[in-house]
Amino acid sequence: MDGFASDTAPIVKDNFKSSWQAEQPLVIIADTKILAAAPTELKSSGFGDMVAKYIGLAEWKMANLLIDEYYCPKIAAITSEAIDRITALADRITENSEEAAGAVMEALVLTGLAMKLAGCSRPASGAEHVVSHYLECYKLNRGIWPEFHGKKVGVMTVILNRAYRNIAERVTEVNPHADNTDWDLVYSKYDACMLNDIKRVNTPTITDKVSPEKLKESWGEIRKIILETLPTDEKLLSLMHA
Protein backbone atom coordinates (compact mmCIF):
# COMPACT_ATOMS: atom_id res chain seq x y z
CA MET A 1 0.00 0.00 0.00
CA ASP A 2 1.51 3.32 -1.06
CA GLY A 3 -0.14 5.05 1.89
CA PHE A 4 2.33 3.39 4.26
CA ALA A 5 5.15 5.65 3.04
CA SER A 6 3.23 8.89 2.54
CA ASP A 7 2.32 11.53 5.09
CA THR A 8 -1.41 11.28 4.46
CA ALA A 9 -3.86 8.57 5.43
CA PRO A 10 -7.07 7.64 3.58
CA ILE A 11 -9.53 7.14 6.42
CA VAL A 12 -13.19 6.12 6.32
CA LYS A 13 -15.27 8.14 8.77
CA ASP A 14 -19.05 7.74 8.84
CA ASN A 15 -18.79 5.74 5.59
CA PHE A 16 -17.04 8.62 3.81
CA LYS A 17 -13.44 8.19 2.67
CA SER A 18 -11.13 11.18 2.69
CA SER A 19 -7.44 11.93 3.18
CA TRP A 20 -6.12 13.05 6.55
CA GLN A 21 -2.74 14.52 7.41
CA ALA A 22 -0.48 11.99 9.10
CA GLU A 23 3.15 11.42 10.05
CA GLN A 24 5.44 9.67 7.59
CA PRO A 25 6.99 6.54 9.14
CA LEU A 26 10.72 6.42 9.81
CA VAL A 27 11.02 2.75 8.89
CA ILE A 28 8.93 0.28 6.89
CA ILE A 29 9.73 -3.42 7.30
CA ALA A 30 8.25 -6.06 5.00
CA ASP A 31 9.00 -9.80 4.99
CA THR A 32 8.98 -10.94 1.35
CA LYS A 33 8.45 -14.56 2.38
CA ILE A 34 5.17 -13.64 4.08
CA LEU A 35 4.15 -11.35 1.22
CA ALA A 36 4.85 -14.06 -1.37
CA ALA A 37 2.60 -16.49 0.53
CA ALA A 38 -0.29 -14.00 0.70
CA PRO A 39 -3.61 -14.88 -0.99
CA THR A 40 -3.62 -14.36 -4.75
CA GLU A 41 -6.38 -11.75 -4.53
CA LEU A 42 -4.31 -9.59 -2.21
CA LYS A 43 -1.25 -9.73 -4.45
CA SER A 44 -3.38 -8.95 -7.49
CA SER A 45 -4.83 -6.00 -5.60
CA GLY A 46 -1.37 -4.58 -4.97
CA PHE A 47 -0.60 -4.95 -8.66
CA GLY A 48 -3.88 -3.22 -9.56
CA ASP A 49 -2.99 -0.28 -7.34
CA MET A 50 0.34 0.07 -9.16
CA VAL A 51 -0.97 -0.01 -12.75
CA ALA A 52 -3.40 2.70 -11.65
CA LYS A 53 -0.42 5.06 -11.45
CA TYR A 54 -0.48 5.39 -15.25
CA ILE A 55 -3.58 7.57 -14.94
CA GLY A 56 -2.15 9.68 -12.14
CA LEU A 57 1.03 10.44 -14.08
CA ALA A 58 -0.89 11.48 -17.20
CA GLU A 59 -3.25 13.71 -15.24
CA TRP A 60 -0.36 15.29 -13.35
CA LYS A 61 1.27 16.32 -16.64
CA MET A 62 -2.05 17.68 -17.91
CA ALA A 63 -2.64 19.65 -14.70
CA ASN A 64 0.80 21.19 -15.06
CA LEU A 65 0.04 22.16 -18.65
CA LEU A 66 -3.46 23.51 -18.06
CA ILE A 67 -3.30 25.21 -14.66
CA ASP A 68 0.45 25.41 -14.05
CA GLU A 69 0.25 22.93 -11.18
CA TYR A 70 3.63 21.95 -9.73
CA TYR A 71 5.20 19.04 -11.62
CA CYS A 72 8.57 17.40 -11.09
CA PRO A 73 9.90 15.01 -13.77
CA LYS A 74 12.29 13.40 -11.27
CA ILE A 75 9.47 12.55 -8.87
CA ALA A 76 7.30 11.32 -11.74
CA ALA A 77 10.21 9.10 -12.80
CA ILE A 78 10.17 7.39 -9.39
CA THR A 79 6.63 6.22 -10.05
CA SER A 80 7.23 5.47 -13.72
CA GLU A 81 10.27 3.29 -12.99
CA ALA A 82 8.36 1.48 -10.23
CA ILE A 83 5.57 0.71 -12.70
CA ASP A 84 8.08 -0.59 -15.24
CA ARG A 85 9.63 -2.93 -12.71
CA ILE A 86 6.42 -4.61 -11.63
CA THR A 87 4.88 -4.79 -15.10
CA ALA A 88 8.00 -6.67 -16.19
CA LEU A 89 7.08 -9.24 -13.53
CA ALA A 90 3.33 -9.23 -14.28
CA ASP A 91 3.16 -12.95 -15.07
CA ARG A 92 4.71 -13.80 -11.70
CA ILE A 93 2.70 -11.54 -9.39
CA THR A 94 0.29 -14.28 -8.29
CA GLU A 95 3.02 -16.88 -7.85
CA ASN A 96 4.69 -17.64 -4.53
CA SER A 97 7.61 -15.47 -5.65
CA GLU A 98 9.57 -13.39 -3.18
CA GLU A 99 11.05 -11.36 -6.03
CA ALA A 100 7.63 -10.43 -7.44
CA ALA A 101 6.08 -9.78 -4.03
CA GLY A 102 9.06 -7.69 -3.02
CA ALA A 103 8.85 -5.71 -6.24
CA VAL A 104 5.20 -4.85 -5.64
CA MET A 105 5.88 -3.84 -2.04
CA GLU A 106 8.89 -1.75 -3.02
CA ALA A 107 6.97 -0.11 -5.88
CA LEU A 108 4.11 0.88 -3.58
CA VAL A 109 6.50 2.25 -0.96
CA LEU A 110 8.35 4.26 -3.61
CA THR A 111 5.13 5.82 -4.90
CA GLY A 112 4.24 6.70 -1.32
CA LEU A 113 7.58 8.47 -1.03
CA ALA A 114 6.88 10.20 -4.34
CA MET A 115 3.65 11.60 -2.88
CA LYS A 116 5.54 12.94 0.12
CA LEU A 117 8.18 14.56 -2.11
CA ALA A 118 5.56 16.11 -4.39
CA GLY A 119 3.38 17.30 -1.54
CA CYS A 120 0.32 15.84 -3.24
CA SER A 121 -1.15 12.51 -4.37
CA ARG A 122 -0.58 13.14 -8.10
CA PRO A 123 2.34 10.66 -8.46
CA ALA A 124 0.17 7.84 -7.15
CA SER A 125 -3.47 8.42 -8.00
CA GLY A 126 -5.90 10.08 -10.35
CA ALA A 127 -9.51 9.83 -11.49
CA GLU A 128 -9.48 6.04 -11.08
CA HIS A 129 -9.02 6.50 -7.33
CA VAL A 130 -11.81 9.09 -7.17
CA VAL A 131 -14.30 6.71 -8.80
CA SER A 132 -13.06 3.86 -6.61
CA HIS A 133 -13.66 5.94 -3.48
CA TYR A 134 -17.17 6.76 -4.69
CA LEU A 135 -17.93 3.06 -5.16
CA GLU A 136 -16.49 2.29 -1.73
CA CYS A 137 -18.65 4.90 -0.01
CA TYR A 138 -21.70 3.77 -1.99
CA LYS A 139 -21.27 0.17 -0.86
CA LEU A 140 -20.39 1.00 2.75
CA ASN A 141 -23.59 3.01 3.11
CA ARG A 142 -25.51 -0.10 2.06
CA GLY A 143 -23.63 -2.51 4.26
CA ILE A 144 -21.93 -4.16 1.27
CA TRP A 145 -18.32 -5.38 1.33
CA PRO A 146 -16.55 -2.76 -0.85
CA GLU A 147 -13.88 -5.12 -2.26
CA PHE A 148 -10.15 -4.57 -2.01
CA HIS A 149 -8.88 -1.10 -2.89
CA GLY A 150 -6.43 -2.25 -5.56
CA LYS A 151 -9.07 -4.39 -7.21
CA LYS A 152 -11.40 -1.42 -7.61
CA VAL A 153 -8.76 1.02 -8.86
CA GLY A 154 -7.39 -1.63 -11.22
CA VAL A 155 -10.80 -2.07 -12.85
CA MET A 156 -11.35 1.69 -13.05
CA THR A 157 -7.89 2.13 -14.58
CA VAL A 158 -8.90 -0.09 -17.49
CA ILE A 159 -12.12 1.88 -18.02
CA LEU A 160 -10.57 5.36 -17.72
CA ASN A 161 -7.46 4.43 -19.70
CA ARG A 162 -9.73 3.31 -22.52
CA ALA A 163 -11.79 6.52 -22.30
CA TYR A 164 -8.75 8.79 -22.32
CA ARG A 165 -7.13 7.05 -25.27
CA ASN A 166 -10.39 6.97 -27.25
CA ILE A 167 -10.75 10.73 -26.82
CA ALA A 168 -7.11 11.43 -27.71
CA GLU A 169 -7.23 9.21 -30.78
CA ARG A 170 -10.58 10.41 -32.14
CA VAL A 171 -10.91 14.06 -31.13
CA THR A 172 -8.43 16.15 -33.09
CA GLU A 173 -9.91 19.58 -32.30
CA VAL A 174 -11.97 20.99 -29.44
CA ASN A 175 -14.06 24.11 -28.93
CA PRO A 176 -14.26 24.37 -25.13
CA HIS A 177 -16.62 26.59 -23.17
CA ALA A 178 -16.97 27.48 -19.52
CA ASP A 179 -18.01 24.60 -17.30
CA ASN A 180 -21.79 24.19 -17.16
CA THR A 181 -21.95 20.96 -15.19
CA ASP A 182 -25.28 20.40 -13.47
CA TRP A 183 -23.84 19.97 -9.99
CA ASP A 184 -27.27 19.35 -8.48
CA LEU A 185 -27.51 16.30 -10.75
CA VAL A 186 -24.04 15.19 -9.67
CA TYR A 187 -24.86 15.59 -5.99
CA SER A 188 -28.12 13.68 -6.44
CA LYS A 189 -26.06 10.54 -7.11
CA TYR A 190 -24.60 10.66 -3.61
CA ASP A 191 -26.29 9.56 -0.42
CA ALA A 192 -27.69 12.41 1.66
CA CYS A 193 -25.33 11.62 4.54
CA MET A 194 -22.34 12.37 2.30
CA LEU A 195 -23.52 15.60 0.66
CA ASN A 196 -21.81 18.07 2.99
CA ASP A 197 -18.48 16.29 2.65
CA ILE A 198 -18.84 16.00 -1.13
CA LYS A 199 -19.61 19.70 -1.51
CA ARG A 200 -16.69 20.58 0.76
CA VAL A 201 -14.12 18.65 -1.30
CA ASN A 202 -15.58 19.98 -4.57
CA THR A 203 -15.44 23.67 -3.66
CA PRO A 204 -14.01 25.13 -5.79
CA THR A 205 -14.91 22.62 -8.49
CA ILE A 206 -12.18 20.81 -10.40
CA THR A 207 -12.77 22.86 -13.56
CA ASP A 208 -12.82 26.34 -12.00
CA LYS A 209 -9.15 26.93 -12.77
CA VAL A 210 -9.26 25.59 -16.33
CA SER A 211 -9.42 28.26 -19.03
CA PRO A 212 -11.37 27.20 -22.16
CA GLU A 213 -8.86 29.15 -24.25
CA LYS A 214 -5.92 27.38 -22.63
CA LEU A 215 -7.60 24.02 -23.14
CA LYS A 216 -8.12 24.71 -26.84
CA GLU A 217 -4.57 25.99 -27.26
CA SER A 218 -3.11 22.96 -25.45
CA TRP A 219 -5.26 20.24 -26.97
CA GLY A 220 -2.53 18.90 -29.24
CA GLU A 221 -0.12 18.58 -26.32
CA ILE A 222 -2.82 16.98 -24.16
CA ARG A 223 -3.41 14.33 -26.81
CA LYS A 224 0.33 13.71 -26.95
CA ILE A 225 0.55 13.31 -23.16
CA ILE A 226 -2.29 10.80 -23.14
CA LEU A 227 -0.99 8.72 -26.03
CA GLU A 228 2.61 8.71 -24.78
CA THR A 229 1.89 8.14 -21.08
CA LEU A 230 -1.03 5.72 -21.09
CA PRO A 231 -0.63 2.15 -22.37
CA THR A 232 -2.77 0.81 -25.17
CA ASP A 233 -5.91 -1.04 -24.14
CA GLU A 234 -4.40 -4.29 -25.40
CA LYS A 235 -1.21 -3.84 -23.36
CA LEU A 236 -3.08 -2.93 -20.18
CA LEU A 237 -5.48 -5.87 -20.46
CA SER A 238 -2.55 -8.17 -21.16
CA LEU A 239 -0.83 -7.00 -17.97
CA MET A 240 -4.00 -7.43 -15.93
CA HIS A 241 -4.58 -10.94 -17.27
CA ALA A 242 -0.98 -12.08 -16.81
Can you say where each PLM-predicted feature lies in the sequence?
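A glycine/threonine-rich phosphate-anchoring loop and its flanking beta-alpha core
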Residues: 1-82
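Active-site segments that bind and position negatively charged phosphate/pyrophosphate groups
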Residues: 77-238
